[in-house]
């Protein structure tokens, strides 16, 4: 049986790049950017994701709602994963999970040549 490793991380609610860099240089394995309980914008969160990624740490984002746009934007920015709050039904959970993956080839956006 492989030896299990304990994973340790922390949460960020302050959109400060210098503080994030200090935390990202610490021995944490992962950092959660908390959009639900902060006034942080998506642009600020994207900057923090880049800082965390540059320090070779995992970044997770707790989004404010089950917004597909927020999920896709944070994953496109490089987040390692999403934490979704207040999931109360199977359908909500499935919609969030589906938003985390690219749609199948049958549902792609039209390319410019198709227009």
Short names for language-model regions:
Residues 1-9:
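N-terminal amphipathic alpha-helix/helix-capping segment at the start of soluble metabolic enzymes
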Residues 8-10, 31-33, 59-61, 82-84:
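Hydrophobic faces of well-ordered beta-strands that scaffold small-molecule active sites
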Residues 12-15, 62-68, 86-87:
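Glycine-rich beta-to-alpha transition loops that act as phosphate-gripper elements at the mouths
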Residues 15-26, 39-54:
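Glycine-rich, positively charged N-terminal anion/phosphate-binding segment
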Residues 15-30, 88-90, 95-98:
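Alpha/beta enzyme core
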Residues 38-51, 67-69, 88-103:
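Active-site-adjacent beta->alpha loops and helix N-cap segments on the catalytic face
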Residues 69-80:
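Catalytic cores of alpha/beta
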Residues 107-115:
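Single conserved hydrophobic/aromatic residue that forms the stacking wall/gate
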């Amino acid at each position: 049986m492989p030896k299990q490793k304990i994973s340790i991380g922390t949460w960020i609610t302050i959109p400060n790049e210098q503080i994030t860099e200090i935390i990202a240089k610490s021995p944490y394995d992962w950092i959660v950017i908390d959009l639900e309980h902060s006034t942080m914008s998506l642009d600020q969160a994207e900057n923090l994701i880049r800082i965390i990624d540059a320090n070779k740490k995992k970044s997770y984002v707790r989004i404010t709602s089950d917004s597909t746009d927020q999920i896709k934007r944070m994953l496109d920015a490089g987040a390692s994963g999403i934490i979704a709050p207040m999931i109360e039904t199977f359908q909500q959970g499935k919609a969030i999970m589906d938003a985390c993956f690219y749609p199948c080839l049958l549902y792609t956006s039209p390319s410019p040549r198709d227009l």
